[in-house]
């Protein structure tokens, strides 16, 4: 597989926020989101065998949480699926973060899918494969990264229309960060004020989780390897 980086940090998103986690970040993405914070994954990386990747993961921690991310990791599905199965068989709790643009049917059942449905302001709205809803299980999660009120309304209606609260364990509404965010560790970098987003969720009585990218408040937004 083509790998951009492997490192250990704290999980900064999803319902697993705050838990120590090994991140295996795969190279390449077929989307170009307006607010993308990982453009460095689009090209480059290094070719690694399954054994080499597994050895690096074990060196960082013999067990615990592993997230497969990117880029879009399912672009390398053929090699990735057996690797995820190996991690699960070795006792790791495995998450995969994906846009849902690629089919999800072959992701192992024990792997938690964290699906980032793209909102209109991302420039990739409509990229989600609606048939992937049938591949979701009760332990999976869906995330919407929200840049403005229109994005919020899209996420709200998508959630209601498809009954997501009853389909997955968590539906997460997260404010997008500015692409040029640098230096300070505060909410001023968010494209939509987290307080506004919280108020909208409360006003509409949505059964969703407000998610902040915690790592961008612990470290600076541009810091890599965290």
Curated annotation (Swiss-Prot):
Residues 16-221 form the Radical SAM core domain. SUPFAM superfamilies: Radical SAM enzymes (SSF102114). Pathway: Purine metabolism; 7-cyano-7-deazaguanine biosynthesis. Its EC number is 4.3.99.3. Mg(2+) binds at residue 38. It is an enzyme of class 4 (lyase). It comes from the Bacteria. HAMAP family: QueE. Belongs to the radical SAM superfamily. 7-carboxy-7-deazaguanine synthase family. This is 7-carboxy-7-deazaguanine synthase.
């Amino acid at each position: 597989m083509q790998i951009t980086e492997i490192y250990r940090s704290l999980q900064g998103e999803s319902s697993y926020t705050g838990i120590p986690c090994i991140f295996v970040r795969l190279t390449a993405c077929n989307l170009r989101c307006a607010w993308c914070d990982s453009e460095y994954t689009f090209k480059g990386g290094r070719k690694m065998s399954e054994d080499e990747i597994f050895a690096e993961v074990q060196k960082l921690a013999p067990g615990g949480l592993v997230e497969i991310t990117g880029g879009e990791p399912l672009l390398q599905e053929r090699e990735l699926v057996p690797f995820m199965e190996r991690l699960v068989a070795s006792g790791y709790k495995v998450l995969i973060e994906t846009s849902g643009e690629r089919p999800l049917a072959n992701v192992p059942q024990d792997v938690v899918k964290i699906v980032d449905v793209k909102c209109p302001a991302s420039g990739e709205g409509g990229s989600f494969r609606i048939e992937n809803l049938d591949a979701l299980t009760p332990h999976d999660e869906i995330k919407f990264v929200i840049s403005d009120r229109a994005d919020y309304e899209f996420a709200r209606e998508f959630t209601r229309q498809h009954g997501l609260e009853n389909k997955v364990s968590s539906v997460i509404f997260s404010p997008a960060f500015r692409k040029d965010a640098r230096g300070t560790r505060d909410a001023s970098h968010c494209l939509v004020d987290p307080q506004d987003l919280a108020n909208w969720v409360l006003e509409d009585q949505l059964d969703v989780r407000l998610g902040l990218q915690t790592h961008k408040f612990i470290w600076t937004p541009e810091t890599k390897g965290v």
